[in-house]
């Protein structure tokens, strides 16, 4: 493959944009690439770069494109909106339609407020929890990523792990002192922290996907529900990734556990910028202009994102078998990946839930938290990534992210993916002398 146009664009970009990208993981630095690939179009399960290289895509815009790229039902609806205008700074029926659909489907949400990003949604949900409880402290889990607001950018996952750190400069000690962190999955330590009844909220990814995918034990989430209820602490499920992907009603439907507040993003915008936070009416009615918890946004409830999200979720609702089909595709890949790993004596642990999975290059049986994830052999991951990319398969450029499948991925594309994974594992096995 030739990458000249992408390399030239990157050289230009680094003179104009910090690091040449608008989100750090996109720079491809952790996988030892000279430049990232610059994308010009997508269709179905495939994308094409500026050098006209074709790829089977397992990033899917980091999760929103559960139907695949450029799905006709979504594009058709978006075109209708664009013909009338892009944004008005005033309400439209489309945001009401989307809100009604979300409230109808997501178990915990009685009222919802739309935002323009997942970061904005989690930041606002934490503010709301503090106002409702009249407490300042919050509890999050190591390796879970909830966007880049100051209070939540502590022992975080996603791009921070990719860059080799877990916190950010520029966050004051005053902010940091109110953010408590614990290892994911340790309910006894949660009980110890919450017993003083001075923590406003516990925020958690019900399926962590930003330290690589972690397979959640239902008992841990049930434990969080019980201890937060007992201590008057707000339980926030960050379902920006899992919402409408693990099941139509998200992880809370999948596990049968109802939080107090939920944050959403990605799929609810159908590939356009969006976020949302919602929950119990008595809590949500503290949000301005009803209450004094302020949230606003020039593009909140944007008609294009609202209509794209409505079209996507409506399609999912009308075709409930999609979730079973996606899980079957994922399991087909995983079963064969594990066979190939044994064939070439490559140490891996493959975690999956629904249509998400991560191949951890580790010499342990199970990856269950950040400490386990950090044992990954990132050199082996780099070989895996580069072999895939150079043979027409694009995956997240980080050991600490999840692969995403869409309904557009075909058996033929899955089999081609396995052929290239075999190439990668063979290289890794030869390097290790096995």
From Swiss-Prot:
Annotated localization: Cytoplasm
Gene Ontology molecular-function annotations: glutamate-1-semialdehyde 2,1-aminomutase activity; pyridoxal phosphate binding; transaminase activity
One BP term from GO: protoporphyrinogen IX biosynthetic process
PROSITE patterns per UniProt: AA_TRANSFER_CLASS_3
InterPro entries according to UniProt: 4pyrrol_synth_GluAld_NH2Trfase (IPR004639), Aminotrans_3 (IPR005814), Aminotrans_3_PPA_site (IPR049704), PyrdxlP-dep_Trfase (IPR015424), PyrdxlP-dep_Trfase_major (IPR015421), PyrdxlP-dep_Trfase_small (IPR015422)
Keywords associated with the record: Cytoplasm, Isomerase, Porphyrin biosynthesis, Pyridoxal phosphate
Chemical reaction(s) catalysed: (S)-4-amino-5-oxopentanoate = 5-aminolevulinate
Entry cofactors: pyridoxal 5'-phosphate
Superkingdom, taxonomy of origin: Bacteria
Residues with PTM N6-(pyridoxal phosphate)lysine: 266
EC number: 5.4.3.8
This protein's pathway: Porphyrin-containing compound metabolism; protoporphyrin-IX biosynthesis; 5-aminolevulinate from L-glutamyl-tRNA(Glu): step 2/2
Keyword Isomerase in annotation: yes
GO CC list: cytoplasm
NCBIfam families attached to this UniProt entry: hemL, PRK00062.1
Subunit structure: Homodimer.
Similarity-based family: Belongs to the class-III pyridoxal-phosphate-dependent aminotransferase family. HemL subfamily.
Designated name of the protein: Glutamate-1-semialdehyde 2,1-aminomutase
């Amino acid at each position: 493959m030739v990458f000249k146009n992408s390399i030239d664009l990157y050289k230009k970009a680094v003179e104009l944009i910090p690091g040449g990208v608008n989100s750090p993981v996109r720079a491809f630095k952790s996988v030892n690439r000279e430049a990232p690939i610059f994308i010009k179009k997508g269709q179905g399960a495939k994308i094409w770069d500026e050098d006209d290289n074709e790829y089977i895509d397992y990033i899917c815009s980091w999760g929103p494109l559960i139907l695949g790229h450029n799905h006709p039902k979504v594009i058709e609806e978006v075109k209708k909106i664009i013909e009338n205008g892009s944004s008005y700074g005033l309400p439209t029926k489309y945001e009401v339609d989307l809100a009604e659909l979300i409230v109808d489907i997501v178990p915990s949400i009685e009222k919802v407020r739309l935002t323009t990003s997942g970061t904005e949604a989690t930041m606002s949900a934490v503010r709301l929890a503090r106002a409702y409880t009249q407490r300042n402290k919050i509890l999050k889990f190591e390796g879970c990523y909830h966007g880049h607001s100051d209070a939540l950018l502590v022992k975080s996952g996603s791009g921070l792990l990719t860059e080799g750190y877990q916190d950010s400069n520029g966050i004051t000690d005053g902010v940091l002192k109110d953010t408590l962190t614990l290892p994911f999955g340790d309910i006894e330590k949660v009980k110890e922290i919450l017993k003083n009844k001075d923590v406003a909220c516990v925020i958690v990814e019900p399926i962590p996907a930003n330290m690589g995918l972690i397979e959640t034990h239902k008992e841990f989430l049930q434990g969080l529900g019980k201890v937060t209820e007992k201590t008057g602490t707000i339980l926030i499920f960050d379902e920006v990734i899992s919402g409408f992907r693990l099941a139509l009603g998200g992880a809370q439907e999948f596990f049968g556990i109802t939080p107090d507040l939920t944050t959403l993003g990605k799929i609810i915008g159908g590939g356009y910028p969006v976020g949302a936070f919602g929950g119990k009416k008595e809590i949500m009615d503290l949000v301005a202009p009803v209450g004094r918890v302020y949230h606003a946004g020039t593009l909140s409830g944007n008609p294009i994102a609202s209509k794209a999200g409505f079209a996507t979720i409506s399609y999912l609702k009308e075709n409930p078998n999609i979730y079973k089909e996606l899980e079957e595709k994922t399991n087909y890949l995983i079963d064969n990946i594990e066979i190939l790993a044994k064939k070439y004596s490559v140490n891996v642990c493959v975690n999956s839930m629904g249509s998400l999975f991560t191949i951890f290059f580790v010499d342990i049986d199970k990856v269950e938290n950040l400490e386990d994830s950090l044992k990954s052999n990132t050199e082996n991951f780099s070989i895996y990534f580069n072999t895939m990319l150079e043979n027409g398969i694009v995956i997240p450029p980080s050991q600490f992210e999840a692969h995403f499948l869409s309904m557009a991925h075909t058996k033929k594309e899955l089999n081609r993916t396995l052929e290239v994974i075999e190439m990668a594992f063979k290289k890794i096995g030869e390097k290790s002398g096995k």
